[in-house]
Amino acid sequence: ASRLLDQDRIDLVLCFAPSCQVVEGFRSTFAAVLGRRLDGQIGAVGAAYTYQAMEYRDEGFWQLLDDYRVLVVFDEIHHCAGHDPLLSNAWGQQILHRIQDRAAFTLALSGTPWRSDDKAIALARYSSPEGLLICDYRYGLKDAIADCVCRSPRIVLLDNQKVKLTEQLGADSSVKLFPSIAKLLGESPVTYEELLRHDEVINPILDLGCSKLNELRQIKPDAAGLVVATDIEHAQQIALALEAMGEDCRIVTNKTPDAQQVINAFRSSTCSWIIAVGMISEGTDIPRLQVCCYLSRIRTELHYRQVLGRVLRRTGESDVQAWLFMLAEPTLQR
């Protein structure tokens, strides 16, 4: 954007993102780099909005794309589906209808460039007949580690070679032994979500996370940990477990009043742990997060990668590794 402005190839910059956190990050980062505001007010170089806000922009707003040379930046573009307006989701339709052929330049970004429903991503190009995504530029984790932008991830899988399942049948009970968590989940009625709520699963994972975080805080005193919980009740259960271990923590969920303020306060504090339900995923920027305990029932590759990304951002010379602790569940292992 800075180069295009300096070369007099654009007049304005518009940014769109899936969440308010990322929008705020766009505004502050672009303002710092360009030396001009991105708040949409008079004198600003542009504006940043959520994808949801696109449908509430009036015709006068979209006329800017015809009257000026505009660079439009899309973050996490995989949220916007479709090449054909009839097969697109609501956000994809707005891009196809309002922006695609009117912007002077577009930059579409994604750390996870695919969709779980297998629909095409808006603005993306695909090979024929294979249907593989064609990227103009790839910057992977290996590149980011080499450039000292990201930490090298260390993933620890917790398993048990003697899982004991006691089944109560009236006055009688039976005990079955399983050689692994995978066998337990595949050959018994126990579900993965039930397992995640068991104290004998929660505590060992938290123990591993706390030990590693305490080790890291000897070098980097404000290093922090993230626990990804399944729901609010689960988050409260995890908070009690952490407090019993003598750890301080915060909970943030989609029901938390002023959730963004809670995240912002945690970002600049020295509190050790934050427990999240659906709030700290893609785009949330808390660089001091360096350890994650994954206790979410969601097992998609998309969600897993997004969560791992929360602990990868490097902030200095000493924080070269990030740690993720989780159960050895077959889908996650793949």
Model-derived segments and their meaning:
Residues 248-334:
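Conserved RecA-like P-loop NTPase helicase motor core
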Residues 3-32, 230-233:
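Conserved Walker A/P-loop ATP-binding site and its immediately adjacent core
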Residues 19-22, 50-57, 79-82, 229-233, ...:
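Conserved helicase motor
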Residues 11-14, 34-47, 239, 243-261:
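Conserved RecA-like helicase motor-core motifs
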Residues 12, 43-46, 68-71, 102-108, ...:
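Loop/turn-to-beta-strand initiation segments
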Residues 63-108, 112-115:
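SF2 helicase catalytic motif II
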Residues 118-222:
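Interdomain helical connector at the RecA1-RecA2 junction of SF1/SF2 helicase-like NTPases
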Residues 30-64:
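Inter-Walker segment of RecA-like/P-loop motor cores
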